[in-house]
Amino acid sequence: MSPNTGESNAAVYASSTQLARALYGGDLVSWIKHTHPGISLELQLDVPVKLIKPGMSQTRPVTVVRAPMGSGKTTALLEWLQHALKADISVLVVSCRRSFTQTLIQRFNDAGLSGFVTYLTSETYIMGFKRLIVQLESLHRVSSEAIDSYDVLILDEVMSVIGQLYSPTMRRLSAVDSLLYRLLNRCSQIIAMDATVNSQFIDLISGLRGDENIHTIVCTYAGVGFSGRTCTILRDMGIDTLVRVIKRSPEHEDVRTIHQLRGTFFDELALRLQCGHNICIFSSTLSFSELVAQFCAIFTDSILILNSTRPLCNVNEWKHFRVLVYTTVVTVGLSFDMAHFHSMFAYIKPMSYGPDMVSVYQSLGRVRLLLLNEVLMYVDGSRTRCGPLFSPMLLNFTIANKFQWFPTHTQITNKLCCAFRQRCANAFTRSNTHLFSRFKYKHLFERCSLWSLADSINILQTLLASNQILVVLDGMGPITDVSPVQFCAFIHDLRHSANAVASCMRSLRQDNDSCLTDFGPSGFMADNITAFMEKYLMESINTEEQIKVFKALACPIEQPRLVNTAILGACIRIPEALEAFDVFQKIYTHYASGWFPVLDKTGEFSIATITTAPNLTTHWELFRRCAYIAKTLKWNPSTEGCVTQVLDTDINTLFNQHGDSLAQLIFEVMRCNVTDAKIILNRPVWRTTGFLDGCHNQCFRPIPTKHEYNIALFRLIWEQLFGARVTKSTQTFPGSTRVKNLKKKDLETLLDSINVDRSACRTYRQLYNLLMSHRHSFSQQRYKITAPAWARHVYFQAHQMHLAPHAEAMLQLALSELSPGSWPRINGAVNFESL
């Protein structure tokens, strides 16, 4: 059922109500019966998963299990292995996470399954162990002889394993993709399990192995820890309570007075902490995990924080803490089964560089039992977008079951789904892969939906419902009883709440940062800092500015932006990179490899690995266009003040030429699905998408013009790729200098730019009066492009070469590795390689 392989279930991809449910296997039973009746289908209703014992007559070579979290999938697997493992049986287990690998080997050992080795403990790089647990990224380390000889292939969390193909840490995509495909095609016995196994995976296996060789188990048992759980999505975070408690304002010296407040995330959290409850808190962002821990510390010092900056601890230690705060570092493979925590709180912030909703869903399921069976969730939509570029694609399936969405809503969202499907079909077309190409739709869907608040909530609710968790909308009741109008009103309230608290949250995070006065890294870290500065920065940067750069790089989104800025500058300095892919590839790998030193809020240095994208051809096409735009607009982020002013007509002209191709390119590179101008720029679509995504004021605003659409697209690309802000200029004249600060030379330059004769003017006053009499010539709308503060220190333009001799020398050294034939031959130049 792949969108690029003539799927048999094509109608699902055009259905805004069915799409999410189908992608996560909600329609698997009916789909198999209708499309693949030859597949053996077993329904296990309200009982834990049970696998057919090896050797029984019903056994088939491939077993696929779809079952919710907490249904006993891994336990059933262990029992199966205990019966299957004879002395001569070889087994390969492919894991999706390092933590999952460690959990599996522990459970295998506890179950008495001997002989298993993990890639983590292997003393050799190439592995040929008879029984091996390996993470997908390391699959290329398994010897070719071993790959072809394994008797049993186990893919626990199979959809997560396939999802790892799209991870930025996947460095050998083609090799790993080919090996996994080979295993699926040849291994004599396969067990694949996941809570979200879908028809797309079944279709793949059917094509490889044949329907007659597949047994599919669909289990509905979710366990009492999930089936009795209620998840309430709150309308308000309660930012006032957070500020009062953290800053200890006089009116709240005694935090016990908070018990009078109810209904918001922090009010409810404070109430339960005051009552002595044990609370687990999931946060989809690192910064909020630290902030909420600071809030909880007012009530108790028994707090465990698990995030990317802190060491993990054994899951059995969790019971010793009143409060557990964790991020997506706690995911599949880690489960806490004790009845210790009363309630769970969840803060979820959909954003382009954050975890997708499947990762959030998996992390929410790590605590298996809650004494009060309640999850209180706040979804922060401050980083999601509305029109004119973004439109929600999904209509909630649960609501559609009881109420009818308006026909206009259905028709428009179905059209958007079709447009998305077509864009997916055109993506990664040069990727020489089997699985990566086949499952790209699901990956792109999960990443692109993070730009939409409504889509993110719809996907999360679909996943929670598959685990029999009832979702309740604050003030409205169970989502099963909510009408379409009520649901859209709730999305509107959430968006309004998030926008209201965004600046306050930003201020709190900044206050939480330490003021660094000491800067003296030594040893290994000092060497890394020196290497980074010589590679990317100009030598004129002082120590204070260095600290600011390293602190900025602690934010994950700023790291690729700095790399992109350096690459763009190199492409402008070396125009051959825009003509020859090999030259661009060398520039790209030079800057997009290695490490970044980052400075966290505690003043500690750490290393962040720079990841290289697999689809460099797409990156080349994108940077070719961005370089042309930057040169045309004369954009230089390293100018004084990091500000460039451009005419809106210039932006519009450029994006009339390149807008369509840029939309497809950023779809692949940035995982950003921009709604086509031909679709969004008409009244029914404009009003409907605004209503569905909670932007109700959009319903009453005029439809944007193509000109405004182009400006918005430019703003998006420059912000996401380079961290630049594009805003309307309010200055009378071009440039960063205010009118009262203009010097005589500035006045002359401005008059010359509009071809005004100034020969009769001798004094400053005369020039000023002449300029003001012609100020109508500067009335055209201009935009300011403000680069981030760190950008002024990045080596960007050729005239800065003397300020960055090391950076230039390092790049030239990398380029010297290219053969003469890699450089473009233009204007009749001789091909010396052929002589």
Swiss-Prot record:
GO term, biological process aspect, one: DNA replication
Pfam family, one: Herpes_ori_bp
Signal peptide: none
InterPro entries: AAA+_ATPase, Helicase_ATP-bd, P-loop_NTPase, Replication_origin-bd
GO cellular component terms, A-Z: host cell nucleus
Sites where the protein binds ATP: A67, P68, M69, G70, S71, G72, K73, T74
Gene Ontology molecular-function annotations: ATP binding; ATP hydrolysis activity; DNA replication origin binding
Cellular localisation: Host nucleus
Keywords for the protein's UniProt record, in alphabetical order: ATP-binding, DNA replication, DNA-binding, Host nucleus, Nucleotide-binding
Domain (Helicase ATP-binding) ranges: 54-215
Cited function: Functions as a docking protein to recruit essential components of the viral replication machinery to viral DNA origins. In the presence of the major DNA-binding protein, opens dsDNA leading to a conformational change in the origin that facilitates DNA unwinding and subsequent replication.
Annotated organism of origin: Varicella-zoster virus (strain Oka vaccine) (HHV-3)
Quaternary structure and interacting proteins, as annotated: Homodimer. Interacts with the major DNA-binding protein. Interacts with the helicase/primase component 52 and the polymerase accessory protein.
Name under which the protein is recorded: Replication origin-binding protein
Listed PROSITE patterns: HELICASE_ATP_BIND_1 (PS51192)
Family according to the record: Belongs to the herpesviridae OriBP family.
